[in-house]
Amino acid sequence: MSKFRTHIGIILAMILAVSPLAVYSATAATGGPKDAVITLQSPFLDASNTSEAKSNQQMADGWVAKGWFGTGLVFQVSFAPVGSTINLTYNVKDKNGKPLAFTRVNLRINKGYSEAASIVEVDGVRTKGIDRPPFDQANVIRLTDAFGNITFALKNLDLESSAEPEPDSFTSKPIFSDDKLDRLHSQMLPEVSSEPADHSVITEFHYFKPKAPIVVPATKPTITLVSPKLDATNSVLDAGKNLKQAYAPLGGDLVVVYKVTGDDGRAVPSKVVDLKVNGGKSTLKATTDAFGYAAFTVKNADTKPNSAPASATSAMPAASSAFATLVPEITGTTAAVAEGVEFHYYRGISSSVAKSGKDFVVSVAIAGAAGKTASVAVTGAKKASVKLSSAMQVVPVKVKAGAKTVTVVIDGKSYTSKVVAK
């Protein structure tokens, strides 16, 4: 490879159906926050299912040493059947490990210098399979969710006659001739700010023609939650329901991804997964990809939010006014494991302050009020009326030093917080 620069009636859900914000561009920097740490959540790749893991990572380390990419760059090469779909799910955090929620991510598809000749499609945006560096073949921009997650369905559209031979294993070298004319691969790089400012991951897939149909028995499948990654720092466990519970801003999209493995522990491709919402009052459907991952994007449209929790691990409200309980299942099977998850939706504010020259900036984060108009008042600053377009929107307010009371009014209800600028 060359150098390459609830209530159920009002819970709406979509399966990978959020419209992209922009498509097709060159390699211009995305311009988001610097030092974003971007990791691949699905498919999960490591030395057991990638080609020449050690040498490829050494290559990536060399690109970092040259200053082309930010530190921590990961480069992995794997395989997928020609004509298959791969659900690429990424998690984005800042350098301190805090999720970068509702942040623009540019998926650079068959990026410049990738030498990729595959025809792939994301959100209806299709590559031409012609590498013309420094230009990417396609770009799709989406927003991360409240947990910093984002997912893209990468569909390969090449003919079987164009595919590479199936490798002996996923740790083998891709099989193609020295002139590379029969090589068929795609290559993706998610970007938040720029190549040097991000700490990202480049993933390359070689498309092969299977020697035989891929069939994985799954009479007792294991269906595990991959995204969001919930633990003791961002969720609580309801032992009675045997599921994890987490808070999310009202009105925001959530990426929910499951991994399905069969009776022998292998990934189950092309299997429909039903996601039962609130006891089966509604059902969402998604099909597992080439690596056994089913990806859902769930959109909340409740109108009566819960109060903001004191922390992400606060007990869930006894009588929640906005929630969604999600449980996966596969028709005709009895799951050995089926991990459910429950989200409780809230509205509230938080404030932080930072030095800006001789003055300070109070950042007022308003959660769960997309589509609303908020009155924002901070001690010593002029009151502002702000139209909110995101489920988590930050309003910057310039102030002088001193103690500040932040008051936000939405639909006649006041939300307050206090900070000290010093």
Predicted regions and their residues:
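Bacterial N-terminal signal peptides that target proteins for export
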Residues: M1-I11
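Bacterial N-terminal signal peptides
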Residues: I11-P20
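The feature marks long extracellular or luminal low-complexity segments
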Residues: S19-K422
